[in-house]
Amino acid sequence: MKFSEIAQKLSPLVQSQSLTAYPDRNPQIKAITPIETALVDTISYIEGGKFASFVAKTDATALILPLDSNLQQQADERGIAWLASANPRLLFAHAIKLFYQPFQPQPYIHATAVVHPSAKIGHKVAIGAHAVVEANVTLGDGVCIHPNAVIYPGVHIGDRTILHANCTIHERVQIGNDCVIHSGAVIGAEGFGFVPVPEGWFKMEQSGIVVLEDGVEIGCNSTVDRPAVGETRIGSQTKIDNLVHIAHNCQIGQACALAGQVGMAGGVKLGNRVILAGQVGIANQAAIGDGAIATAQTGIHNDIGAGEVVSGSPAMPHKLFLKVAAAYKRLPEIYQAVKQLKK
């Protein structure tokens, strides 16, 4: 693909004032690669920061750059064709689609798939080998069910949603349009509901449902549990990594991002655009406001306000956590000083 063709296809995707290109070179681009291993005839991207130095040494034939005149000049001097954008990472994400399309089977129902006669199947649906679609399931247009996926009775799945191999969707779950459920994920299993009695524990039946709004993505081996009553809901465009647990009655807002090994107890509420880094744990009924961020391994026991950035366990403002961490490193020294004062 010629560089000019790439530029032409990408230019409508960004605001015109935030995209520039060096027009005098039009090389052939054969692949898209990370900047660290870029070779001749490939295109890569640089956001700046520690990667800025790669402009001077990369073998890439073309680059997507930030709106940085110094980096652009370096690329010119090395004969590298370039595009520049206010958001080079986003432009690079669009560029990947020009070179790669994920596997999408043709519409068909495999001979070994088990589809209940009462299931309603939309147009251009693919159902892979050994998949199970039980009674009263509704599949929208363009849905793709990969091999060994299991869909329990009464599930509704919206248009163009993809269920990857070996995922399980329990009864009455509602999944919107353009969602992606990755392999091994379990949506709508029973929440952890038991009442203590003298004999041990009395099981509370989980009669509620799980709702995934449009554009939700659930990573491999993640779980979203249904509640005893009511619903567990994940807002539109929220993205959830692998190995995440979302307990019963959780309410997650729109466009949130949850990294691997996040664990949420029952009844947690997240606002919109909340970011939870890896291994964040959230206690029962805690509420987190819009735009809040929790850094890796934060333990949240109480409510967090909108826009707050928290770290540590128990969670505290990130700036305070940095001071605490600095003091923690000096504890042996401080201990010895206190010990001397006691003498």
Curated annotation (Swiss-Prot):
Listed pathway(s): Bacterial outer membrane biogenesis; LPS lipid A biosynthesis
Domain of life: Bacteria
EC code: 2.3.1.191
Coiled-coil region: none
Alphabetical list of Gene3D superfamilies matching this protein: Hexapeptide repeat proteins, MurE/MurF, N-terminal domain
EC top class, as a word: transferase
One GO BP annotation of this record: lipid A biosynthetic process
UniProt keyword annotations, A-Z: Acyltransferase, Lipid A biosynthesis, Lipid biosynthesis, Lipid metabolism, Repeat, Transferase
Keyword flag Iron: no
Known catalytic reactions: a UDP-3-O-[(3R)-3-hydroxyacyl]-alpha-D-glucosamine + a (3R)-hydroxyacyl-[ACP] = a UDP-2-N,3-O-bis[(3R)-3-hydroxyacyl]-alpha-D-glucosamine + holo-[ACP] + H(+)
Enzyme active site: 248 (proton acceptor)
MF-aspect GO terms: N-acyltransferase activity; structural constituent of carboxysome shell
Gene Ontology CC entries for this record: carboxysome; membrane
Cited InterPro entries: Hexapep, LpxD, Trimer_LpxA-like_sf, UDP_GlcNAc_AcTrfase_non-rep
Subunit structure: Homotrimer.
Function: Catalyzes the N-acylation of UDP-3-O-acylglucosamine using 3-hydroxyacyl-ACP as the acyl donor. Is involved in the biosynthesis of lipid A, a phosphorylated glycolipid that anchors the lipopolysaccharide to the outer membrane of the cell.
Protein family: Belongs to the transferase hexapeptide repeat family. LpxD subfamily.
Name used for this protein in its record: UDP-3-O-acylglucosamine N-acyltransferase
